[in-house]
């Protein structure tokens, strides 16, 4: 019996941050990539792939090695001859909120659709049980390539893949709200699982409540709608019908919120791929996000996360 397959689409970048000793350090991160790492950590039997563009620079070589260390295949890391990987610097304020500076314009990942066409590789891809992308996956592309990505995902869905999408709205990536809404709607149209935050919908569409988000999403063929509502908790809907509400549990401390949503998405999707109920999947995903915000950086140290996962498993069994 084959392992379930999970492919995430997007951009992994070099992450620069300053240590407590005022020294510069680097790692690798990106929203859908982070989610994929946490999915693999939660459900080790997953075969995980990351579809993106990389360069021929030294950071690209180190980056794909980083993927492999985390159990992520680099089989679909498509190499550009003249573009390198993107870079971002992160600074956290006293509340753990993050502030970014980016150097990603025309990075290799922004050329993804051209790289797919040039390599003529799509026809050789295996079946993917789950395809995951985000508003950022779309936002880095030209409009022509956004359309090509939506068409690619439509083809994968037609072959039996389930599609998951997180809006992850970043205003600076879009010409204006109308531009972002156009592509949000295109993404919702092809998605089976949607993981919006209330802030996404409020900022883009003016939705002031979870019920407004649910009513809006009823025009799409969304099977699972998981609305992250901050301190109000998480609300789950199955084919438009209310399923459950998981209350918000604050973390003991909040050091870095960089990957809270990414870890939530990864663990939730991994649980669902392991046939766990939506409510339990949300509980585990929320707990994982609560752990991640207590540590610096997008990817929590493996031993810390594994110990947390084991404690949670023991508690669940008990």
Curated annotation (Swiss-Prot):
Listed EC numbers: 2.7.1.45
Keywords, ordered alphabetically: ATP-binding, Carbohydrate metabolism, Kinase, Nucleotide-binding, Transferase
Family: Belongs to the carbohydrate kinase PfkB family.
Name of the protein described by the UniProt record: 2-dehydro-3-deoxygluconokinase
Active site: 262
Species of provenance: Pseudoalteromonas atlantica (strain T6c / ATCC BAA-1087)
Gene Ontology molecular function terms on file: 2-dehydro-3-deoxygluconokinase activity; ATP binding
Binding site for ATP: 168-170, 228-233, 259-262
Catalysis performed (reactions): 2-dehydro-3-deoxy-D-gluconate + ATP = 2-dehydro-3-deoxy-6-phospho-D-gluconate + ADP + H(+)
Domain of life: Bacteria
Function statement: Involved in the degradation of 3,6-anhydro-L-galactose, which is the major monomeric sugar of red macroalgae. Catalyzes the fifth step of the pathway, the phosphorylation of 2-keto-3-deoxygluconate (KDG) to 2-keto-3-deoxy-6-phosphogluconate (KDPG).
Residues annotated for substrate binding in this entry: 30-34, 88, 102-104, 170, 262
Pfam families per record: PfkB
